[in-house]
Amino acid sequence: VLINTQNNPSGAVYSAETLKKLAQLMEDKQKEYGHDIFIISDEPYREIVFDGKKAPYVSKFYDNTLSCYSFSKSLSLPGERIGYVAVNPTCTDADLLVPMMSQISRGIGHNCPSSLIMMGVEDVLDETSDMTVYETNMNLLYDKLIELGFSCVRPSGTFYIFPKALEEDAVAFCNKALKYDLVLVPSDSFGCPGYFRMAYCIDTEKVVRSLDALERFVKTEYPDR
């Protein structure tokens, strides 16, 4: 079972209560089917959580958990694909899974990070970039979307927001936005038509400039709203 929290594209963060319920469901299904079920927890946005909260770890609630992490988000190094898979020590066959994980990158050679970047990351394991800029950007963008009449859930983390498009065809909606220098991702790419994803992992100044473009887009293309 693969989970992604904090979630791309919605920005949702699963609560401890949700993860406990998931863990109980997995325990029940393991007994029902008579074999182990593993959770692969995709956690590249772990530090990007808003309102002073911290994201819970599913491995605290479920033994058979593999946690996948990437430094590309916490250190603002999106071009450097470097991270790790943490095997819960209480996981079934943990002694076999650890060496298996270490062999994966060797088998897919182009995913191997350079020695230089590995040494660099080792020196900053407990450091992060300034994560507060994402919350500032999110609040600016969310408030403007609500002001313009979009239906949108306020993100709890990541640097994405996932509003409902102003027409059923999200692809057409995003294509219209291009005329206003707004690059949006239609939700069809995520198997959920009718929405679009916006990213705000940029300078706050650029987010502010985009708000005017967003308003022009909506008022010009959808004047009856």
Task: Name each model feature, range by range.
Residues 1-225:
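PLP-dependent class I/II
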